[in-house]
């Protein structure tokens, strides 16, 4: 309802602050242009509770990325204040933020996902790893400090860099096309195929503007149905709600591997979720409207 007061939460203090500011501005501009009573609030600092109590919004559009928007604290706060919001619950956010916990749940349910374990000093020293592998923080997003590692020397460097962001995981490397699917509650949108600027879809590839996106992805009808069903099942198994995105690798044997679930995806007009929606004829403003109207 357009007579409701909406707060767009963006910014914050995570390493993904700059990306979040862009998402928040795009969403806020869209809501205002559509006639919504919307204001933006930078979640940086310690004044968020006071700002929300002062504004008394009916709904919050969560455009925070990284720990600020995806570790469950913002969801818990909004739920405590009885404010409807566009992201997953506190419990689901905690699960999806931790890639290892997410992976363990998916593997328990026999969902296709690459094998992984925590990387430690001892494991680095053992030198018994079959390369290539992926090394990344177990929490975080935007592929910050994520590496494709091909040797023990590269492993040591990757471990050192990734450990700056907390616990580190090492994951089986899967070669194939990078595919993603956006979901808003029961609405599963078209898959998008990403051709990254670099060897894989790392931070630079995501924000340089030089990667190529195919939306729709060009999958045959059967494979499109399969990837959408896998995305929705993963979304449901991890307890997601609202807007989320599921990332896959599609190998040359026709197998999909679930890489991760993002509970607060980017929301600029060039972000992946809007591209997923646009492939089905849903423009950016309409997509923003669908997300906010379904806030829970």
Curated annotation (Swiss-Prot):
UniProt keyword terms in alphabetical order: ATP-binding, Cell shape, Cell wall biogenesis/degradation, Cytoplasm, Ligase, Magnesium, Manganese, Metal-binding, Nucleotide-binding, Peptidoglycan synthesis
Catalytic activity line of the entry: 2 D-alanine + ATP = D-alanyl-D-alanine + ADP + phosphate + H(+)
A biological-process GO annotation: regulation of cell shape
Annotated metabolic or biological route of this protein: Cell wall biogenesis; peptidoglycan biosynthesis
SUPFAM superfamilies assigned to the protein according to its UniProt record, in alphabetical order: Glutathione synthetase ATP-binding domain-like, PreATP-grasp domain
A GO term from the CC aspect: cytoplasm
Binding-site residues, ATP: 129-180
Compartments, as annotated in UniProt: Cytoplasm
Gene3D superfamilies the UniProt entry points to: 3.40.50.20, ATP-grasp fold, A domain, ATP-grasp fold, B domain
Cofactor needs: Mg(2+); Mn(2+)
Superkingdom of this protein's organism: Bacteria
Binding site for Mg(2+) 2: 260, 262
InterPro entries the record matches: ATP-grasp (IPR011761), ATP_grasp_subdomain_1 (IPR013815), D-Ala_lig_Van_CS (IPR000291), D_ala_D_ala (IPR005905), Dala_Dala_lig_C (IPR011095), PreATP-grasp_dom_sf (IPR016185)
Residues binding Mg(2+) 1, per UniProt: 247, 260
GO molecular-function term, one example from the UniProt record: metal ion binding
Cofactor binding note from Swiss-Prot or TrEMBL: Binds 2 magnesium or manganese ions per subunit.
Record-annotated ATP-grasp domain positions: 103-293
Top-level enzyme category: ligase
Family listed: Belongs to the D-alanine--D-alanine ligase family.
PANTHER family, per database record: D-ALANINE--D-ALANINE LIGASE (PTHR23132), D-ALANINE--D-ALANINE LIGASE B (PTHR23132:SF23)
NCBIfam families listed in its UniProt record: D_ala_D_alaTIGR, PRK01372.1, PRK14569.1
Function: Cell wall formation.
Name of the featured protein: D-alanine--D-alanine ligase
């Amino acid at each position: 309802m357009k007579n409701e007061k909406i707060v767009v939460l963006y910014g914050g203090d995570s390493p993904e602050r700059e990306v979040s500011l862009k998402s928040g501005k795009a969403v806020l501009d869209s809501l205002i242009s559509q006639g919504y009573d919307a204001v933006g609030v930078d979640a940086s600092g310690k004044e968020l509770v006071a700002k929300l109590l002062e504004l008394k919004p009916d709904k919050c559009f969560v455009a925070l990325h990284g720990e600020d928007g995806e570790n469950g604290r913002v969801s818990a706060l909004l739920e405590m204040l009885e404010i409807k919001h566009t992201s997953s619950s506190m419990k689901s956010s905690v699960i999806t933020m931790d890639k290892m916990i997410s992976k363990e749940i998916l593997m328990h349910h026999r969902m296709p996902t690459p094998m992984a374990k925590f990387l430690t000093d001892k494991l680095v020293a053992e030198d018994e790893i079959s390369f290539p592998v992926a090394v990344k923080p177990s929490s975080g997003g935007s592929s910050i400090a994520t590496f494709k590692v091909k040797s023990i020397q590269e492993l040591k460097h990757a471990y050192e860099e990734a450990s700056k962001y907390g616990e580190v995981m090492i994951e089986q490397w899967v070669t194939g096309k990078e595919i993603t699917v956006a979901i808003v509650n029961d609405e599963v949108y078209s898959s998008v195929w990403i051709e990254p600027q670099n060897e894989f879809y790392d931070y630079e590839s995501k924000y340089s503007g030089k990667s190529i996106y195919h939306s729709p992805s060009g999958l045959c009808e059967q494979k499109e149905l399969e990837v959408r069903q896998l995305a929705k099942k993963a979304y449901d198994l991890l307890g997601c709600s609202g807007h989320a995105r599921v990332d896959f690798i599609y190998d040359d044997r026709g197998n999909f591997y679930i890489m991760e679930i993002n509970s607060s995806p980017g929301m600029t007009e060039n972000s992946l979720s809007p591209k997923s929606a646009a492939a089905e004829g849903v423009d950016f403003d309409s997509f923003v409207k669908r997300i906010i109207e379904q806030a829970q």
